Amino acid sequence: MSEQLRQTFANAKKENRNALVTFMTAGYPTVKDTVPILKGFQDGGVDIIELGMPFSDPIADGPTIQLSNTVALQNGVTLPQTLEMVSQARNEGVTVPIILMGYYNPILNYGEERFIQDAAKAGANGFIIVDLPPEEALKVRNYINDNGLSLIPLVAPSTTDERLELLSHIADSFVYVVSRMGTTGVQSSVASDLDELISRVRKYTKDTPLAVGFGVSTREHFQSVGSVADGVVIGSKIVTLCGDAPEGKRYDVAKEYVQGILNGAKHKVLSKDEFFAFQKESLKSANVKKEILDEFDENHKHPIRFGDFGGQYVPEALHACLRELEKGFDEAVADPTFWEDFKSLYSYIGRPSSLHKAERLTEHCQGAQIWLKREDLNHTGSHKINNALAQVLLAKRLGKKNVIAETGAGQHGVATATACAKFGLTCTVFMGAEDVRRQALNVFRMRILGAKVIAVTNGTKTLRDATSEAFRFWVTNLKTTYYVVGSAIGPHPYPTLVRTFQSVIGKETKEQFAAMNNGKLPDAVVACVGGGSNSTGMFSPFEHDTSVKLLGVEAGGDGVDTKFHSATLTAGRPGVFHGVKTYVLQDSDGQVHDTHSVSAGLDYPGVGPELAYWKSTGRAQFIAATDAQALLGFKLLSQLEGIIPALESSHAVYGACELAKTMKPDQHLVINISGRGDKDVQSVAEVLPKLGPKIGWDLRFEEDPSA
């Protein structure tokens, strides 16, 4: 079937024309529309069809394709159903090549080899896997070639010559050239420097055809791009037209749009019998066009993986962002002046944060001696300021004037806005609309500090969606923008970078505890776990001190036996999400779950890869605390120690108290109080009527009997 792709481009070249490639998301606008739209494409004169495999978190795509994915998933489309649509289209006479385009996690969840075999049987010709890194592509391509199909690599304006050389070896039918940095979507004009990009790519791809996409929507665009490329890809425009078309008219809309692009030109297509004969022969005699490299190793100063977890599972355009960031980070941490600059800010932060015993909490829990590491006393009220200031220093070293950040509870947003105000950089914070509602105080704090807050209305309107939007913005505005990721999540180098800057928490804890306990180590350290910034910061300095138990407490929401929780390590499975392989809350089709937590800062369906590694090796243990249990932790610390903790930290307080009960009175554990709780007072007031009775806590005002 890869041979059919090669023949398609060869025929177009022989006929002195460009191959037209059109895109549609499977199951959009409805499931029953998909096959008619594909037939409309073919009848209009399309050479190749890209069929999008719906995914819950398509970070490389703009609003149009995002919407089509969301609608398709709401329509119940799964990966097996997508393959069934391909099979149905073939049986109804669609014989032009069909390429399945999508993201890696649903394929990984399905099983790569089984998925490729099933796709070949259904009648697919190949795949574009948007976020598949080259080192993984080498393995996957072998499965694909064994089944006679093709893996089409994506290259971007930012793709290095080294990567171009590798990707040209991967290509056995054609290469998809992303014409501009950013996400998919209609543009008013084609990229002005396209000639130069195509020329650079051809140095490595030689005679392999190049198809160019991103922003093409008119016949004029088609002709302009076609003057330098072999094929032209159109996606968002036709998705919009079909979505807007009335029911029963979508075949006609697809056909007429393609005819307009091609000015009515047609080409010969295979009959149904010819196609099935071609498919049968292809499956029997799969062959590889050219040799492929066995391995691909880019140089990295710091390992990009933690065991099986980590990596850089991102769209090709994002590699430029990560490469620049990694180089800047490597140089900074090797430069003593960077650390001098950072440590000179300790007095501004309020470091070292205090460590002290919680006498009354210890007495209440009746077990180990409980200590509190008071990150809530930092400037801005949480541990987030450590990472935010360090990354803003890094942004200045890289010459960036604009800083963006994502935030859930708002603590990271406030910390980043604070750092930007101190150093004179502009700050834009992406925040889910639901989090904007429940964390109004922090939103106003950010605005007071001069930051612009963008409420993200996609998806669940929480941290996950804010993170996706921040990545999309970054790749479009790399030249001037630095992205301060707030947790130990995302592609390399972010997990290493955030852990490095937050490890001051664990280092101080170790030193302070030893100074007060004759050089001893604590027996356990406890932290809440969302993405992992405070937990990796607390745990990493103790990683090799195996006598110290590491306990992470996740957000159990309504309970891990329900759908309403954020306990990724407790209830998730390995997958790929936001550019990294880690534990992910996902359904049976590999779609990322909606999450729930009373705490906005823990409301995230992934987790840092280092935490995933520690779980897999047994070095750290993880439990989940429900919303009610977290509220109990909130109450205990408030009323026994006079410290109102953040709801995030309240999970750790509850988990630590339960752990302390199993320990001896001469043992010691430390809780990382990652943030203060003034931001959560309104949230607690909202949930108390529901959760208060579960823990025996009623704060309602009694009526004055004398009134």
Swiss-Prot record:
Q: What is the name listed in the Swiss-Prot or TrEMBL entry for this protein?
A: Tryptophan synthase
Region spans: Tryptophan synthase alpha chain? 1-297
Q: Which PANTHER family match?
A: TRYPTOPHAN SYNTHASE, TRYPTOPHAN SYNTHASE-RELATED
What family is reported? In the N-terminal section; belongs to the TrpA family. In the C-terminal section; belongs to the TrpB family.
Q: Does the keyword Lyase apply?
A: yes
Catalytic residues? E50 (proton acceptor), D61 (proton acceptor)
Q: Which organism is it from?
A: Saccharomyces cerevisiae (strain ATCC 204508 / S288c)
Q: Name one GO biological process term.
A: L-tryptophan biosynthetic process
What InterPro entries does its record include? Aldolase_TIM, RibuloseP-bd_barrel, Trp_synth_b_CS, Trp_synth_beta, Trp_synth_beta/beta-like, Trp_synthase_alpha_AS, Trp_synthase_suA, TrpB-like_PALP
Which UniProt key words apply to this protein?
Amino-acid biosynthesis, Aromatic amino acid biosynthesis, Lyase, Phosphoprotein, Pyridoxal phosphate, Tryptophan biosynthesis
Lyase recorded as keyword: yes
Catalytically driven reaction(s): (1S,2R)-1-C-(indol-3-yl)glycerol 3-phosphate + L-serine = D-glyceraldehyde 3-phosphate + L-tryptophan + H2O
Name the pathway it acts in: Amino-acid biosynthesis; L-tryptophan biosynthesis; L-tryptophan from chorismate: step 5/5
The N6-(pyridoxal phosphate)lysine modification is found at K384
Q: Which residues form a coiled coil?
A: none
Q: Which CDD domains match?
A: Trp-synth_B (cd06446), Tryptophan_synthase_alpha (cd04724)
PROSITE patterns noted in UniProt = TRP_SYNTHASE_ALPHA, TRP_SYNTHASE_BETA
